[in-house]
Swiss-Prot record:
Localization per record: Microsome membrane; Early endosome membrane
Binding site for substrate: S164
EC class of the enzyme, as a word: oxidoreductase
Lineage: Eukaryota, Metazoa, Chordata, Craniata, Vertebrata
Signal peptide stretch: 1-17
Record: residues binding NAD(+): 33-57
EC code: 1.1.1.105, 1.1.1.209, 1.1.1.239, 1.1.1.53
Official protein name in the record: 17-beta-hydroxysteroid dehydrogenase type 6
Organism from which the protein derives: Homo sapiens
Active site per UniProt: Y176 (proton acceptor)
Family the UniProt entry places it in: Belongs to the short-chain dehydrogenases/reductases (SDR) family.
Record-level Gene Ontology MF annotations: 5-alpha-androstane-3-beta,17-beta-diol dehydrogenase (NADP+) activity; all-trans-retinol dehydrogenase (NAD+) activity; androstan-3-alpha,17-beta-diol dehydrogenase (NAD+) activity; androsterone dehydrogenase [NAD(P)+] activity; catalytic activity; electron transfer activity; estradiol 17-beta-dehydrogenase [NAD(P)+] activity; oxidoreductase activity
């Protein structure tokens, strides 16, 4: 019996391996539009796809970022400036893409642009910072997707939305987690709504990686600033010792961020080029072996595991 079971499992993984490696044909003729290409995942993905021969349309927030990217890639790659929080900028970028892709449509849309600032507790976070994260990480994704959707539908292409493992397990930085949970929900809803048009939607959930968003110096400085600007009653409730302990925990976490960004961009590339893309990709060992298993535990147990090393506030009961 065990021999039959082992043979069945082996056959399953062999078929899975074969299925995962089926690649879309004529990649050199396909256009992919990527947001957030100034740095980080978007920048690396743009260079990675360009090296593979795809026609990359890279959206950068700044002209400086666009110029630097053009200097690192072939003449095939073209850039446009895009602020995903402004509808007029999205409309202009959509028209620009339309002029480039023509009747063939847009094969790939990668919603990668995102921000994480500041790293702090919900109660310390001001409304403006929360709204900025929602505007970029969630509303921007929705507006760019809906604007580009007719072009993607024409090509029967792919949409890749970059969420986070914190869109699966909410842990710290409330505004960021809320925005990423929203990306997950939007992606699931849209995937079901447009399933009959041949468009495939994938969600990429990176763990902790060292990018511009997790720059240690900037992140810790913003955390200090957030605490400094917190109302007096907040400081009395939590206490300076609580902040200092939490600051050290965050510092250690940022130091342990992975530097291998290819773990994420390889997932994005697979979602764009595979005949059978996955619905979800968990990128990074922390995502695969800690956060994903954690998401299936009873909530009370997950809460304990996530917060067991946290300090207690000054006025804790």
């Amino acid at each position: 019996m065990w021999l039959y079971l082992a043979a069945f499992v082996g056959l399953y993984y062999l078929l899975h391996w074969y299925r995962e490696r089926q690649v879309v044909s004529h990649l050199q003729d396909k256009y992919v539009f990527i947001t957030g290409c100034d740095s980080g995942f978007g920048n690396l993905l743009a260079r990675q796809l360009d090296a593979r021969g795809l026609r990359v349309l890279a959206a950068c927030l700044t002209e400086k970022g666009a110029e630097q990217l053009r200097g690192q890639t072939s003449d095939r790659l073209e850039t446009v400036t895009l602020d995903v929080t402004k509808m007029e900028s999205i409309a202009a970028a959509t028209q620009w893409v339309k002029e480039h892709v023509g009747d063939r449509g847009l094969w790939g849309l990668v919603n990668n642009a995102g921000i994480l600032t500041p790293i702090t507790l919900c109660e310390w976070l001001n409304t403006e910072d929360s709204m900025n994260m929602l505007k970029v990480n969630l509303i921007g994704v929705i507006q760019v997707t809906l604007s580009m959707l007719p072009l993607v539908r024409r090509a029967r292409g792919r949409i890749v939305n970059v969420s986070s493992i914190l869109g699966r397990v909410a842990f710290f930085v409330g505004g960021y987690c809320v925005s990423k949970y929203g990306v997950e929900a939007f992606s699931d809803i849209l995937r079901r709504e447009i399933q009959h048009f041949g468009v495939k939607i994938s969600i990429v959930e990176p763990g902790y990686f060292r990018t511009g968003m997790t720059n240690m110096t900037q992140s810790l400085e913003r955390m200090k600033q957030s605490w400094k600007e917190a109302p007096k009653h907040i400081k009395e409730t939590y206490g300076q010792q609580y902040f200092d302990a939490l600051y050290n925990i965050m510092k250690e976490g940022l130091l342990n961020c992975s530097t291998n960004l290819n773990l994420v961009t390889d997932c994005m590339e697979h979602a764009l080029t595979s005949v059978h893309p996955r619905t979800r990709y968990s990128a990074g060992w922390d995502a695969k072996f800690f956060f994903i298993p954690l998401s299936y535990l009873p909530t009370s147990l997950a809460d304990y595991i996530l917060t067991r090393s946290w300090p207690k506030p000054a006025q804790a009961v």
